Amino acid sequence: MTKKIPRIVLAINYVNYSDVKKKNWQKIAMDVMVKNSPSNVQLVTFNYKDDEVNVPQQFRVFKMLERNSQKTIGNTRPLPYVKDIFDFASQMNCDVFGYLNSDIMVHKEFFDVFDNYKKIDSYLFNRIDIADVSVATFNSKNFHIVWKDHPGFDGIFFRRKWWLINRKRFNDGLIVGEPEWDYYYNKVIRQSTGQIIKKRKLHHVYHNTIWNLTSNGAVNNRKINGAVA
C-alpha cells in the first residue's frame, strides 16, 4: 500500500517591516521556505485587509484577519491573535497545519517529521540562532551557530482532525509577536491526551531583541500563560 503523503499548510503572518535588516531577514526566510518546501506544502500568509503584503508568488495571501490587538486592548502594535491564524489554517484542505514566525528558516528535511502524521497530534519546534546567511549558505549548512538552545517555540503545528476536536482547550486571547503565547500552547498541549513531537528544527538569524514586557499585549499573554500550571 502506498503511504499517503500529508497535505501541509505552513502559515506565516507577513510583517511590513520599516527596519531594513528585519525586512531582509524575513525575505531570506520566505525564499528559503519556497526553495525547501515540497509540493505537498501550501505556503500562506494571513493578514489584515489593509496590510501591504510583499511575499514570493508561491505564497497565497489571505487578508482574513479581523481581531487587532491594538484596537481590542490598546496594544502598542497591531498584532493578530494566534488562535485566529490556527483556525483559518485549519479550514484549508490539509492534514497538518501550523504557524512559523515569518523570519524562521527550515531545511528540506524539516518536513520529514510529518511523515507519521496520522499518529501525531501536535508538533512544537524550537530554533537555533545563527549568524547572517543567504539562501545558498543556509541550504549548504555553511553557517555559524550563535545560540543553539533557544527556549522558545517559533513553530507549532497540529494534525487538523485533532485541532478541530480540541481547539476549545486553547484560550482565544493570546497575541502573536508578544512573549509567552508559545509557552502557553506548550503547557496546554502537554496537558492534552494527544501524541506530541518536540524538535529543534528551526533556524533564525540572531539579533538581540529585548521584549517590551510592559506592553498591553505582553501583560495580556503573561496573565493568560500564568493562569495555567
PLM regions with names:
Residues 6-8, 31-45:
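Short loop->beta transition adjacent to catalytic acidic/histidine clusters or analogous donor-positioning motifs
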Residues 19-22, 49-55, 131-134:
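Short, charged/polar "capping" segments at the starts of alpha-helices
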Residues 40-49, 121-125:
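Short, hydrophobic beta-strand segments that form beta-sheet elements in well-ordered domains
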